[in-house]
């Protein structure tokens, strides 16, 4: 398997640190509004990448965070006249509703920034002790000139970054590119205690701390949109490597941006099309097909007309599948030479820098073959093509997936709620009730594992 590593700019063979296990961190949303198609792209891309790694036999430990304290969240709370927690909790719940509708499987861990403030303070203290961070009257900053490899990920020199980048304007900083680790609280803002006074974490330190605490000081893959390469991922890398002296993430994967009406789709400009509206009008598979039909590193143009075209193409495949399912002949085909050839083509495509356009095209080729086999009354070939779509490739791509249909009986939001309720019960030492929740979930195939970083679960 070869993937393009942003760090080196090259397509490299993927070799995990621990054989058979992949640890990956995907930057998640700042929760102050509904997610849009631009947010959906990394969610779908890395959902499928995780599925494919599992298909290839890897055990994947995936983390996707929620930034639940941020200027945008505070501003939204002020607009609505509510507490910042209300905004964060509301839009995390809305995220799960949209993610479930889009067929996004939950990561193993979904940490919130506010659950890691003590860890963040501890890490900042260590950075200050190492001399790579300093305190000012407005907070604590990372001194980028103390980290020799700053700019390595974005492939830019410090002087070029100063000229072209968006940086925090603060006259108390030693250097324009120095970035905030801890922001001193303004009147009325939510805040936490620290050695530098009451305040809250900076954006970049959040992801560094959550990834290191859950996945370890070095892990395999760090992923997100290409707009995060600088400053967010560059700063994450600088903090982590200055702290530990180790390589932070071995492979960096970044998806291209979604363009809508000629510009990048963005909440800040109001140039958006929500996932909820897209799925409501054109269906889950239509949107997933649209996203996967473009190579993940390429920019993606979005329009409602294009989405409608993808939705129509998906509908035709569903009609072919429905026609076959009426025959009732849904068994297990023989893995003959034709079957193996398709599997090899599928693996070859996704092993080559995760080429989903080729992988998705195989499903449509199989659908055409299935239709012809039914016309020719070739039951053996028809079963083979049907099985490849519904049980072999569909579950990997999250398209036409028979397994997903069965799972929709259980609600992801309900599972998350049960886990949160159980955590509260455990903190209150009401172990009789918390154990009952754990045992009942085990009976339906959901296995809980309590770790220092939170509750992890797997579905058997």
From Swiss-Prot:
<dbReference type="InterPro" id="IPR024909">
    <property type="entry name" value="Cys-tRNA/MSH_ligase"/>
</dbReference>
<feature type="short sequence motif" description="'KMSKS' region">
    <location>
        <begin position="264"/>
        <end position="268"/>
    </location>
</feature>
<keyword id="KW-0648">Protein biosynthesis</keyword>
<dbReference type="GO" id="GO:0006423">
    <property type="term" value="P:cysteinyl-tRNA aminoacylation"/>
</dbReference>
<feature type="binding site">
    <location>
        <position position="267"/>
    </location>
    <ligand>
        <name>ATP</name>
    </ligand>
</feature>
<keyword id="KW-0479">Metal-binding</keyword>
<feature type="binding site">
    <location>
        <position position="27"/>
    </location>
    <ligand>
        <name>Zn(2+)</name>
    </ligand>
</feature>
<keyword id="KW-0547">Nucleotide-binding</keyword>
<feature type="short sequence motif" description="'HIGH' region">
    <location>
        <begin position="29"/>
        <end position="39"/>
    </location>
</feature>
<feature type="binding site">
    <location>
        <position position="236"/>
    </location>
    <ligand>
        <name>Zn(2+)</name>
    </ligand>
</feature>
<keyword id="KW-0862">Zinc</keyword>
<dbReference type="InterPro" id="IPR015803">
    <property type="entry name" value="Cys-tRNA-ligase"/>
</dbReference>
<dbReference type="InterPro" id="IPR015273">
    <property type="entry name" value="Cys-tRNA-synt_Ia_DALR"/>
</dbReference>
<dbReference type="Pfam" id="PF09190">
    <property type="entry name" value="DALR_2"/>
</dbReference>
<feature type="binding site">
    <location>
        <position position="207"/>
    </location>
    <ligand>
        <name>Zn(2+)</name>
    </ligand>
</feature>
<dbReference type="InterPro" id="IPR009080">
    <property type="entry name" value="tRNAsynth_Ia_anticodon-bd"/>
</dbReference>
<keyword id="KW-0030">Aminoacyl-tRNA synthetase</keyword>
<dbReference type="InterPro" id="IPR032678">
    <property type="entry name" value="tRNA-synt_1_cat_dom"/>
</dbReference>
<dbReference type="GO" id="GO:0005524">
    <property type="term" value="F:ATP binding"/>
</dbReference>
<feature type="binding site">
    <location>
        <position position="232"/>
    </location>
    <ligand>
        <name>Zn(2+)</name>
    </ligand>
</feature>
<protein>
    <recommendedName>
        <fullName>Cysteine--tRNA ligase</fullName>
        <ecNumber>6.1.1.16</ecNumber>
    </recommendedName>
</protein>
<dbReference type="GO" id="GO:0004817">
    <property type="term" value="F:cysteine-tRNA ligase activity"/>
</dbReference>
<comment type="subunit">
    <text>Monomer.</text>
</comment>
<dbReference type="InterPro" id="IPR014729">
    <property type="entry name" value="Rossmann-like_a/b/a_fold"/>
</dbReference>
<dbReference type="GO" id="GO:0008270">
    <property type="term" value="F:zinc ion binding"/>
</dbReference>
<keyword id="KW-0067">ATP-binding</keyword>
<dbReference type="GO" id="GO:0005829">
    <property type="term" value="C:cytosol"/>
</dbReference>
<comment type="similarity">
    <text>Belongs to the class-I aminoacyl-tRNA synthetase family.</text>
</comment>
<keyword id="KW-0436">Ligase</keyword>
<dbReference type="Pfam" id="PF01406">
    <property type="entry name" value="tRNA-synt_1e"/>
</dbReference>
<keyword id="KW-0963">Cytoplasm</keyword>
